[in-house]
Swiss-Prot record:
Belongs to the asfivirus B117L family. It is a single-pass membrane protein. This is Uncharacterized protein B117L. Glycans are attached at N29, N68. It is found in: Host membrane; Virion. GO terms for cellular component: host cell membrane; membrane; virion component. The chain crosses the membrane at residues 74-94. Keywords: Glycoprotein, Host membrane, Membrane, Transmembrane, Transmembrane helix, Virion.
Length: 120
């Protein structure tokens, strides 16, 4: 499922999580058109005329920032497997380095200890 966030120059944003609609701006325009025509056709439109007008005004702004957030990220499919293998190899390498360091340190300590015993 894809998400689309659109931000216009006034800072108003539109959120769409319907995967069948490609562009939520088209849907926002259609919705506000329907609201405006319905309000104009209604006899009691005088009290409600302000709200559809602002909706039309805001819906027709060009998108200033268009951000598409889809579920295709690095944790999908092959990318996830490659990341897991890379982390696994990194952990093995670090573990071998640490083991070698500990072994060398212990060996040096034992050698120093034996040398000090031989000197006595």
């Amino acid at each position: 499922m894809g998400y689309t966030i659109q931000l216009d120059k006034d800072g108003d944003y539109y959120w769409d999580e319907d995967p069948t609609h490609h562009d939520p701006y088209m849907r926002a325009n259609a919705t506000s058109h329907a609201a405006a025509s319905h309000a104009a056709a209604s006899h009691a439109a005088a009290s409600h005329a302000a709200a559809p007008h602002t909706a039309v005004h805001h819906a027709f702004h060009e998108p200033f920032i268009k951000l598409n957030l889809t579920d295709k990220n690095i944790f999908n499919g092959l990318g996830f497997i490659l990341i897991v293998i890379f982390i696994y190899l990194l952990i093995i390498t670090l573990q071998q380095m640490l083991t070698r360091h500990i072994y060398n340190t212990v060996q040096q300590c034992v050698k120093t200890h034996l040398d000090s015993k031989n000197l006595q």
